[in-house]
Amino acid sequence: MTSRQEGASSHGSRRSSRHVGSFIIDREIGKGSFAQVYMGWHKESKAAVAIKSVELERLNKKLKENLYGEIQILKTLRHPHIVALHDCVESSTHINLIMEYCELGDLSLFIKKRDKLITHPATHDMARKYPSAPNSGLHEVVIRHFLKQLSSALEFLRAKNYVHRDVKPQNLLLLPSQAFREERALPIMEASQDSLIPISGLASLPMLKLADFGFARVLPSTSLADTLCGSPLYMAPEILRYERYDAKADLWSVGTVLYEMITGRPPFRARNHVELLRKIEAAEDVIKFPREVSVTPDLKALVRSLLKRSPVERLSFENFFAHHVVTGDILGLVEDDIPKPPKRELETIRQGEALPSSPRVQMARQLSSDPRDTRSSPKSPRSSPRSSTVNSSADAAPRRQSQNAERRLSISSHNSGQGLGIQRPAPPIQSHTAPNHPRAADRSGREPQPSSLRVARQPSDVSLTEEEKAAQDVMFERDYVVVERRHVEVNALADELAANEKLGQNNSSAKSSPLQRRYTQQGSATSTTGAIPTPASRTALVAQGRAGQDRRSSYEKALSASPGSASSAISKAIQDASLRLFGYKVNTMRQKGSSPPLYQPFPAYPTPTSAGLLSDGKGSQVSDEDAKAAQAIEEFATRSDCVYGFAEVKYKQLLPMAPSMDYGLGGVSPDKGTSEEDGLTVDATVALSEEALVLYVKSLTLLARAMDIASLWWSKKTRAESSVVSQTLVQRINAVVQWVRQRFNEVLEKSEVVRLKLTEAQKLLPEDHPSNPAHQGEDSIASSAVGAKQVYLTPGISAEKLMYDRALEMSRAAAIDEVTNENLPGCEISYLTAIRMLEAVLDSDDEATARNISSGKEIAKDATQEGSDLDTEEAAHVRKMITMITGRLNMVRKKQQMIAEANNQAKHVSAMRRLSGDVTPRSVPSYGST
């Protein structure tokens, strides 16, 4: 034991104690984004455990909620193929999860080291009997074995309405076979008597356990979630599209894991989730396997049925659990793994039990069935082979199953976790639900298998380039991506407004129209979520992924419909200021193709006449409220556009080659690096990335404010609180909302690119550098407004300070031009842009302002300044600056008006002279007769 303690990692040696409760911390065996995993030992029994130690200081509020949620979930789960939680010990600085120790590591390492499995004692026999084919993945016997155990764990989770949301090879841990563990003198702490005994698959092969429930949550089969989380390479496309999703997202992840076990690599590889979605959409549900892969067609068909872009077309849980690949015998077994049917088991089979006719009836029945009936069904495709394949000895199989089958299938909480400090709730009535329950033997009609002749094998590049391997390793190290509900709300509201733009027509029948009745079923008017969930939205969700579905508004962004927007006032101001500050202009010319523009200015919409806004005069008060809401939305959009233009200056310096026409959305070519091309030092890259990131986040905040106001306004209108609304005004607001949605998605994608650029550059900084993440505290995380992704910023970096300095520079340069009477139109543009930036500095994320605006209350001049992060003196100074710049702006406009009037007067005089015939030049002498 002393030698084990001396072998502890340096990080462990810095901890105040080597003891955690009744356990001793040993060497470090793994490391994640927020936790270290150590091997540990129970003080008395000397049994091995895994200790997941999480440092509380590195977690923000969202991550702490995930951690405590993981603890609560693991306390209630007891299943042989789910990593069990033994104990939880919390201190002032750490939370230590004492969990089952899985000696062989995770499945991703198992796949990557498949050629060396024969050299490991625990996997030598497996690699000898079932070797991996060259340029391929694992042997099909091993694949089916792991699939059975994974499906067993997922079936148990579905019975409890859990969705894991992060199924990936890194979260599938492996144990040596039971026979190998018994030969070695390394005891492993068991959560229960059967927690280390597999209930499916082969007993001679390693045992798989599902781990890491940090993103898991209760999600009934009829519910939808809207938080984007999981690992990028294994995320379902509906999550990547920021759509609501259900538990079937886990089935996509299962398909990706299966594909990786078959081929040795993920089905889709990308640098970020935006590029990943593009590749998934481009594949169009055509999943190709390399020619070197030698697996049966039914296994390939199962993978293809799981990797369907549309959740509606994807294989259901019922059909997945009943699939013959999951329930049937494993083919190709050799030596002792060949099943030997027990003789005495035929005597205990019941023959009169009726089988369910549909998967739904079957699931409902299993949740309320007796456990004895569950395990003794005569035609269970999974229980029958289990009796002969789980234990290699034919004599031991019937005896072990007759003693432990009911306990295994019930996963009873009564016998698990005793004496380990875990208080577990009493099991519900349906807790005996078997993870592997009987099913009908004949399901050929329900599971049609495509002919293998129809699958055209395409040649594929087997050998991965070094760049692909590096990108794949980077994605393996990237634990997860979390995008909150706001992204779903923005797109949902924009789709709803676009679909119902003609709200203002037929105002007389607005209250009785079908459209109005449909929307009266929404939530309360005081909802603060911003998105209005409607049946129409869910109907649209069902149609996702079908042929003809157009999502260009969300991802392949159409260019602005505003004519001449590339030469708009704000664009010109940003270019002029960039020329003064950095020596070059930001190019705003549009390129052809679907790649989003580098800078798409906010379109200038034609202002409708007052008569159009006031309708027939009867609803003047309501129309005035609507006009105020529209004006507020446009003001927030304009401020956001100013901040976005400033961020684009930083982005252009950071990624001069991106986004290109070929690699839009802020991406770069996979075979071209940027560290050598851009010529920036590491310090400059970090500084530019930090500045661009905080500016993008500020722009997103302003866009979200605009959508909040639009959402509240739309909610009021759809509830018929006001039946008078101008169609012109609805079109005006809808146009702004569509622009905001387009810009929101674009900024979100670019901010992710900048974030990745920042984190990669920070890794290259010296340890003593002030911007090194090791020197950053929690304040620097929160200041980025994206703390869920653990982005560390240098102290002092803020969007408000950058915007204030930029506005000051632009106003000073404009003042010089004003004094010399040079470029007065440019002065006006610069003053306007500076005012908008300073207004954005004063703006805060206060939803009360949005409610006041949408409810028609009078908007104070500085309403958006309440709740600002600035102190009183700073806010007063910024307001004073706005007043001064506004005064200069008025002076410039007066000068322009005077010049315009003088020019018009001169033109008028010239025209009058031409009409009177006085066209003789006065400078030409007249020669008369003398």
Curated annotation (Swiss-Prot):
Pfam families: ATG1-like_MIT1, ATG1-like_MIT2, Pkinase. One of its GO terms (biological process) is cellular response to potassium ion starvation. Residues 337-350 have a biased composition (Basic and acidic residues). It catalyses: L-seryl-[protein] + ATP = O-phospho-L-seryl-[protein] + ADP + H(+); L-threonyl-[protein] + ATP = O-phospho-L-threonyl-[protein] + ADP + H(+). It is a peripheral membrane protein. Disruption phenotype: Blocks autophagy. Leads to reduced conidial germination under starvation. Especially, leads to reduced CP15 levels in conidia. Impairs growth of the mycelia on host cadavers and considerably weakens virulence. Homodimer. Dimerization requires the presence of ATG13. Forms a ternary complex with ATG13 and ATG17. This is Serine/threonine-protein kinase ATG1. The gene is ATG1.
